[in-house]
Amino acid sequence: MTASYLHTMLRVTDPAKSRAFYEALGMEFRRESPIVRNGELEATLYFFGFPSQEEELELTFNHDGSTYELGTGYGHIAIGVDVLDATLASLAEQGIEPERAPYQVREGGSWLCFVRDPDGYRIEIIGRG
């Protein structure tokens, strides 16, 4: 049996803010897919990914005005970036600041920090360089 990881879906409340956030992390917008049922626009799916990878992040916007709770089961998504400081500067332009200053888990290890996306999802950002 051959299997592969395809995507993760997160519900969002403001697609434009979410798009700016994930593009600041280096993701590219790939496509938009409206979901129409019984002639009504029910949801719009927005797909993002990194240029060198097939896996995607699907952001779903439900047009019925639903509100969401993050729940206790969600932990975080981890994203590796080439230059942590540059990524954080780009996010700061959107008013997004790290929960605390970047730190190393172990001496000589990668620098990392956590931020929240526009819907409150926790995102770990790990600097590769």
PLM regions and their residue ranges:
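Core segments of cupin and vicinal oxygen chelate
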Residues: T2, M9-E54
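Vicinal oxygen chelate
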Residues: E32-I35, F47, I79, L88-G129
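Helix N-cap motif at beta-to-alpha junctions
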Residues: D14-A16, D82-D85
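Eukaryotic phosphotyrosine signaling hubs
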Residues: Y5-H7, T72-I77
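Short amphipathic alpha-helices within nucleic acid-binding modules
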Residues: F21, L84-S90
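Acetyl-CoA-dependent GNAT
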Residues: F61-H63, G127-R128
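Exposed loop/turn and edge beta-strand positions of beta-sandwich/beta-sheet ligand-binding modules
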Residues: E42, G73, G109
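Arg/Lys-rich, alpha-helical DNA-contact motif
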Residues: S52-L57, E69
